[in-house]
Amino acid sequence: MERDGNLKPWGSLFCKTAETVVQRFYKRQLLNDIKSYMQIKQLLLVILLILFHNQQLVAQQNATQKFSGTVSSDDGLPIPGATVKIGEYIRVTDNKGEFSFDQIIPKSYTISIVYIGFKPIRKSITIGEKQKNRIEFVMDATTHELKNVDVVGRTKVTEVNRQAFNVTALDATKMHNSTLDIAGALDRVAGVRVRETGGLGSNFNLSLNGFSGNHIRFFLDGVPMDNFGSSFQINNIPINIAERIEVYKGVVPMWLGADALGGAVNIVTGDRFRNYIDVSYSIGSFNTHRSVINAAATSKSGFTVQLNAFQNFSDNNYKVTVDASDINTGQYSPGTRVKRFHDQYHNETVIANVGVVDKSFADKLLFGVTLGQNYKEIQTGARMVSVFGQWHRRGNMIMPTLKYQKKDLIKGLDLNFNANYNFGKEQNIDTAYRRYDWFGNYKQYEGKGSERTRTMYKYGNNAGLATTMLNYKLNDNHSFALSNVFSTFDRKGSDEINPSNNAYEQKQKTNKNILGLGYMFNTADHWSLNLFSKYIIQNSIVGQQNLNQTTTQSQFGYGLATSYNFNRNLQLKASYEKANRMPEATEIFGDVENFEGNSNLKPEVSDNVNVGLMYSFSLQDVNRFSISANAIYRNASNFIYYQFNQNQSKLVAGNRDGVTNFGGDIEARYSFKDWLTAGVNVTYQNIINQQEYEGNPPVLSPVYKDRMPNIPFLYGNGDVAFSFKNVGKKGNNLSFGYNLLYVHAFYLYWPSRGTSGDKYGIPKQLSHDVNLLYSLKNGRYNISAECKNLNDALLYDNFSLQKPSRAFYLKLRYFINKTA
Amino acid sequence: MKSTLKNACYAMALIAGISSCSKDKSNDLISENKGNYILTVTPVASTGVADYLLTADNLESGTLSTAGNGLEQDGTFRYYVTTNNKFFSMLYGQGNPGAVTTYNIQNGKLSKLSNFQTETVQAFAPVNNDLLLVKIPRTYGNKANWYQVDTDKLLITSEGQLDVANLTGNGETAHFSWLKQVNNKVFAPYFSIKACCADGFGTNYPDSAWVAVYDYPSMKLEKIIKDNRTSFIGRYFVDGLGVLENGDTYAFSSSVATTGGVFSSKKPSAITRINAGTTEFDQNYYFNFQDASGGMNITNWIYIGGGNFVVNATTAAEKGAYNTGVHIGIVNVNNKTFKAVTGMPDLDKIGSVTDHNFTPKDGRTAYMGVTLKDGSSFVYKIDAVTATATQGLKVEGGTITSISKL
């Protein structure tokens, strides 16, 4: 699943694989990628996809035959990931270029084999008792370009999209020349809104069909990112680290073994190349500098070294329009245009892995470490009238990792194990007893004080994680998966300016285990079924005064996902999950600064139903269309939400009766030949408060059944891209792209209350981004220029917090990969 | 092509089916009442809550609603004060600076005068022609900041710092419960807090009451007066002082000091006095409220004139450091009497009562907000002479958080 061309449903539009600049460039090197491992997650995906899309009929005759073979290139290297089709049967070659049809009815067939960058093989064969049942095929590399272009422009990811789950996969490789981070890329997905409080590195809140915060889980190659800390988050991970980003809206597959409740985002880094260097640097407005180095080297003996390093830096000193107050009298000067002056952000992260691949004892065994640090200045509070000039945060990450993969422990049984432990620390530093205004002037007060809450508290969460995944494929119709995710959290901290705090330091420890069991079944090419269950148990120890209170909570969840193919172009899918989410450590213990703990939180439970539809068609073969539509229904109870504590000094989590969401999204895409693509998506969600009684003691709530405030409910994206081949010189390509973001206005507070003309709200947002890319030598050198917020609109995701004004970026990227 | 069209039809039908299931909620709009009474109303919800300002011309009858009606304020946890014929709407901004919006009333409608910026403060009171604001630290060693807002200019005209670390003399920090102008001084009762760590609002000194006395406008500390007959005066964000017509100041103690999260004061809830013109507790005056009320403690009070206070009280079982009592009574501090008020809704129907209420100071009347568990709210007229409560104005769509008049 990690490679192009895998598991395409035969004959569908999506199968007419696009060949992008990058992919074309990669084609030779892919040969060297034969033995590269598959992440277990991806492996399971393969199995799911085989189950869901495999066109093989159940053998109806006893006299079936086995037929196998290999596919290799004209220079003798095996081709993994090539699609082999015999009649209605489809297989994809493995790492050694091998394929096998276990039960095939003997008769005459047309066999066809396709792989990007090679001339397709198409010939007649007869499978019968007297024929030989093993053939070696050799494919010739093409020199011409494939003419078919995928309408979606998301070739590699199409199959992820076709899972029975409500999932959208983004092909990150298409954005490697942009200056996006993961958050920016996600913002273009239907159903997703990333709400940021400012510029580079600012706090973000990703909402997926109305759920946000800890209801959404993030994964890196299937490993939960919960314990990664602030140095490695979606708002600082550059897009170049990722190969693909999968967004599960609602029902989350079992193999993402976590207690996500509102959805999940899985960042797939992949390792397409055994030997490569990918270096990029971008410079832009507001003194923004970002660079990324990705590299890998693998010896013939299987020793491998992989390195990903990235850095972000920005002053974020963009201009904002504010009501600037006089520092002494408090008088406002409305509509003052000022530059932000205390908003610098930078982070530096290195991920290094050393190990072996393709050994008898392991397909992959990697020891690694992720080192990172970040620094962030805090310019404003929850409103832009609150200005700060010294308050800042720091964090670091020291995380050893272990990855182990072995296929066919016994035939059909694959094992994947991951473990990591984060020794990183986080610190919030607010020691300046000052009050700043928007012009950078300040008043210095005497004594020990702060701009907000005096602290230098430094803490580590000592968070560890171990994931184990076992997958057993009984035969083409049945497979089983068992997963286990164990995580531990043990916060310790101290405050150097308030050492007596240590004496009050309480035990703050949780252990969580999630055991998942899944079964996958498909009868024929028409429908498939995926059943799964998860058992979550969490043990938390909360120190209270002098005794430790231990709480153990357990929940059982289950679900199913199914898809039905009316024909090659029309797929209907549906899924349901009874999902559970345990209270997070931060919610139980607080964070000592801004968040108060609540050890009485109950697990959150929700019913999730998704229904989806994908349809594609073409007119005269040059005009290609695809439409996908998803509907979603959620009903969450014991919903965990945040409110102010009794004396309104900190936030505290609580359970509420819940919210429901009934909504959906529609995406339509169009392409013309191989030089124009365009798309539009729209998301609507009707998120309704189901809390009938509120308060203590409870009273009937006037906003029961009202729409939840301060959540965007109608938004969309549009994009157009033009690409021109061989501009200036053969192998040099030029493309131009345009992106539009629209977010409908929404109220800050409950919609039904108050005189409508006097209500606070977040105005409509409309922003335009344009980009230009020129790539030389088939993608070895790339130069791109971008303009974000072209019309210099005042953009807000959160009330009063303005996002960056118009900005320009230039990015240079060099990519090369070599045969070992 | 035919099958293409067929598929398209399937697709459209499904999409139509999916998208056709929404319903709109319509609200009955109640036209805005004009009047000089201002009620601040908070729709009860856990998130996204704003306060709404509603005006009314009388508190004894009629109906108001926040549905499609009311002047939305930026957030809840707002505090309101009227002085100099102006209404001040102040945000409690979690330690951040915020905007204060001022209104007056013209033709029975609120009219915005201006915005100005202040800090989030924990105590405020009208003093002379000013509004005095004090920002109180919760961390040991910090200083409190005060600000004087000129209520004509609507600007901060002066500011300074108060040492709260050394007021108690016991190593703990002082946290003012409230401020009160008494004659030409500012009385600032405080409670002692550890200001640290896991027991920040706890104390090891739960059995004393203190009042810091400041000169105005210099805000120089003149004196600290202490009394060991009660626990601290007032509560967090609650005015524990009442000044009578003769200048005598009465103080209530709720007896809600905690140590390690547990109530630790051995002193009962009681009322003490500081005589007019003096800055000492009158050791000859002590009214044990707890005994007089059958074991209850005062949570809030409002002085209505003639020595009468309308008090909110909680039973021993209901006692909490922050909750407002739903038992209403009349205390006469001259006679040291307590009378329970009749005519309030049944206790099991009351959700909450308002703690910033209105009195014309006629010695007899107070108007108090009550929210029932069914979500409806009413203004109750409390008559101190008959010790009865009568249901008045109905407010739909929220809890009444304050009642005032311009």
Question: What is the meaning of each model-derived region?
Answer:
Chain B
Residues L71-N84, F116-N129, T168-L179, S231-L241, ...:
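Repeated scaffold domains used in trafficking and secretory/extracellular systems
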Residues M1-L39:
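Bacterial Sec-dependent N-terminal signal peptides
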Residues S61-D74, K109-E119, L155-G171, K220-R229, ...:
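Beta-propeller fold detector
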Residues K180-A317:
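Acidic, serine/threonine- and glycine-rich low-complexity intrinsically disordered segments
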Residues D51-L155:
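Post-signal peptide N-terminal segment of secreted/secretory-pathway proteins
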Residues T279-G375:
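Intrinsically disordered, low-complexity segments enriched in Gly and acidic/Ser/Thr residues
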Residues N33-A45, T83-G93, N128-Y140, K185-S192, ...:
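Short beta-strand elements that form the blades of beta-propeller/WD-repeat-like
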Residues Y52-D57, V100-T102, K143-L154, F201-K220, ...:
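Beta-propeller blade signature
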